[in-house]
A protein has these predicted regions:
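N-terminal accessory scaffold of Fe(II)-dependent oxygenases
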Residues: 2-468, 476-534
Length: 534
């Protein structure tokens, strides 16, 4: 059964959230700006503080030649990608960001349509096919009109709602006891404890004596193209395309293209992405502002196209190539007031936000502060036979508990990803509403359904081509895209680097070698591909 998030009883239940965030907060409406690399890592990365980087006045800070990635040049820069079929996001609920509607077309066609000002498309991260299935599994029939109602509708009587709530409570209670070992491990990651509990016997259906990577199912020693890292050709290709997301994949051949820009070393990159869309600068027709709801407001903003308010699970360096962008930022300290789709479990000192695995985050897997999934980390520890901190049985229990809710439940969900706020973006931009009656109506709606939101401190950051924004993990952001000042309509283009979120300083940014060893495999894959293409 679907129901409106305005009315959903889960969002009103008391929830004990552990908020250990220890980084920068918003004290006024001005963001730091810098054009200097001096002390950058300590001032911003370690301090978990967003900063606008005005690289057009300090080219040493900009990792790319932005002219090469503008709409009129990008096909020359990425010639091998011309005919590559990519997934583009279609506008949904008056904006982008949810990934609910996607369409396949060649990169060349995407560029041509955006150059012509087609506002209905947005090129974002390229997910694997099974990831699309996870995002869209419960969407049912597509809503051809693109209404925001896919978020949830009131369709049933009160008795049905009470029954569903009771079922969720039973499922949650059943799962609580199984999570103790993983929770202890999460606590250990942030406060130094090293004594997990509940290391009971694992599920006999899980062959924990024969743990291995997915690629090992088809691999033997003869199939490894990089034997020292036990990488097959498939895994080599996968690692390169996962880091350099299509259509950027061919940049592995370009040794001048930085996988980690100078000021962010020694962080480890997770993904490098291309973002492309188009927008008109004229004001749009507004929905009914006298009777606002999540469904009616969707991702409407008076002008531009909105991403929706959300946070990431990685540190972000965002480089604007073309167009204009407005980032509206909220600190991880305010996560509870931002009413995420997912049920908050913990906010780590570095800002990373972890969720409870339930029907509101059906594919969620518990994370450490550095973004490592607990189950995958436990497999790694067993593979290298490291039982100093945790016994083998305790690690096996962590793996057993690492099961997505979707595998335990047939519950229906049409909600956004857990990291999205249910607060409509318009409520962050009420100053743009000129009609006082409309503004008062929206204020009343916000105070009723999102109490405290209008009182939160926020940062507003405008980016022009050549500007960059560093955003630590967990910082909520709503991004509104515009055409450039000189155009009534046009394309907007950006590149971004996502980094594994650090938990320490430059000398020891991560708690162990989990990510370092994984990145060594990716670098080996890139070197292999370079030699292969030479």
């Amino acid at each position: 059964m679907k129901r409106s998030l305005d009315q959903h009883p889960i969002s009103k239940r008391p929830n004990v959230v552990v908020n250990e965030y220890a980084g920068a907060i918003v004290s006024d409406n001005a963001i730091d700006e810098t054009a200097s690399p001096e002390g950058f890592f300590e001032k911003y990365v370690v301090a978990r503080k967003p900063v606008k980087i005005t690289a057009k006045d300090a080219s040493a800070l900009c990792p790319i030649n932005i002219a090469r990635f503008r709409v009129d040049k990008i096909l020359e820069t990425l010639p091998a990608a011309r005919k590559r079929v990519l997934q583009v996001e279609k506008k949904h609920a008056l904006g982008f960001g949810s990934g609910k509607k996607r369409e396949s077309m060649t990169f060349e066609e995407i560029v041509e349509r955006l150059a012509q000002g087609d506002e209905s498309l947005y090129l974002t991260t390229q997910y694997e096919e099974h990831d699309y299935d996870e995002l869209n599994e419960s969407d049912g029939e597509s809503n051809e009109e693109g209404e925001a109602g896919d978020i949830g509708k009131e369709e049933a009587d009160e008795a049905s709602e009470d029954e569903e709530e009771d079922e969720l409570e039973e499922e949650t209670t059943e799962n609580e006891g199984d999570d103790d070992a993983s929770k202890k491990m999460l606590e250990s990651n942030s406060n130094g404890d090293d004594d997990p509990s509940d290391a009971s016997s694992p599920d006999p259906s899980i062959d924990l004596e024969n743990l291995h990577d997915d690629f090992d199912d088809v691999a033997d020693e003869e199939s490894f193209v990089i034997p020292e890292h036990q990488l097959t050709q498939d895994e080599v290709d996968y690692r390169v395309s996962s880091l350099l997301q299509a259509p950027l994949t061919e940049l592995y051949k370009d040794k001048s293209f930085p996988l980690v820009p100078e000021n962010f070393r020694p962080l480890i990159p997770q993904q490098i992405n291309l973002w492309m869309g188009a927008c008109s600068n004229k004001r749009k027709d507004a929905p009914d502002l006298f009777s606002p709801s999540i469904e009616s407001l969707g991702r409407y903003v008076p002008s531009g196209n909105s991403s929706g308010l959300h946070h990431d699970h990685a540190d972000n360096l965002y480089v604007l190539v073309q167009g204009r962008k407005r980032f509206t930022l909220f600190s991880p300290q305010d996560a509870e007031a931002l009413r995420t789709v997912g049920e908050l479990q913990k906010i780590y000192p570095n800002g990373l936000i972890d969720y409870k695995t339930n029907q509101r985050a059906r594919f969620w897997r518990p994370m450490r502060a550095d973004g490592a999934m607990i189950g995958e980390w436990a497999r790694w520890m067993i593979e290298k036979e490291d039982f100093k901190q945790y016994s083998k049985e305790q690690l096996e229990k962590m793996i057993e508990n690492d099961v997505p809710f979707a595998e335990k439940s047939n519950s229906e969900s049409n909600w956004d990803p857990p990291s999205f706020s249910t607060v409509p973006p318009l409520l962050a931009h009420l100053s743009e509403i000129s009609d006082e009656r409309h503004r008062e109506s929206l204020q009343n709606y916000a105070n009723k359904h999102f109490p405290g939101f209008l009182n939160l401190h926020k940062l507003e950051v405008w980016l022009e081509p050549g500007d960059m924004l560093y955003l630590p993990t967990g910082w909520f952001h709503e991004v509104t895209s515009f055409a450039e000042d000189s155009a009534s309509a046009g394309a907007h283009v950006a590149l971004n680097w996502w980094f594994v979120p650090p938990t320490g300083g430059r000398d020891r940014p991560y708690p162990d070698e989990y990510w370092k060893k994984d990145y060594e495999k990716t670098l080996a894959a890139i070197e292999y591909k370079r030699a292969e293409s030479a």
